Swiss-Prot record:
This is Citrolysin protein 2. It comes from the Bacteria. Keywords: Cytolysis, Hemolysis. GO terms for biological process: killing of cells of another organism. It comes from Citrobacter freundii.
């Protein structure tokens, strides 16, 4: 049973004061935010994994560059390698939903008292068929 709870989260914007933003947290670890990007709680592990893989690859290519640059003519090759690695590998490891638009809620039910107010009108389940679906 997947349960969503509407909650508030303090979030800073650049150059602005603290602003309370309404969000919906599901118990499968995902966090949906209205009218802004998805802030997924489970995304932090993906980001950390990507950072670790980038660090590992850079260490590997540092050693490969040291092995390659025994002759002086390979210095430019190592520099080109470094440029390619620094451009290509961070592009490969961008987490998948870091810049997505918020999609429809995948949770079965939204539990909040102000469900019929205007702020939750777009968030209301479309019909009772969606709730009873397995």
């Amino acid at each position: 049973m997947n349960i969503c709870i509407s909650w508030f989260r303090k979030q800073t914007h650049a150059g602005q004061s603290m602003r309370r933003k309404k969000g919906v947290a599901c118990n499968n670890g995902s966090f949906f935010q209205r009218r802004s990007r998805i802030k997924a709680i489970g995304n932090l592990s993906v980001v950390w994994r990507s950072i670790k893989t980038v660090i590992i690859w850079e260490v590997i290519y540092i050693f490969a560059g040291i092995l390659l640059t025994e002759e002086g003519s390979d210095v430019m090759r190592m520099r080109i390698l470094f440029v390619i690695i620094r451009i290509v590998f961070p592009l490969n490891f961008i987490p998948p939903n870091s810049k997505n638009r918020p999609r429809t809620i995948k949770c079965k039910r939204v539990l909040n008292m102000t469900e019929r107010s205007n702020s939750f009108r777009s968030f209301r389940p479309r019909s009772s068929i969606d709730i009873s679906r397995p």
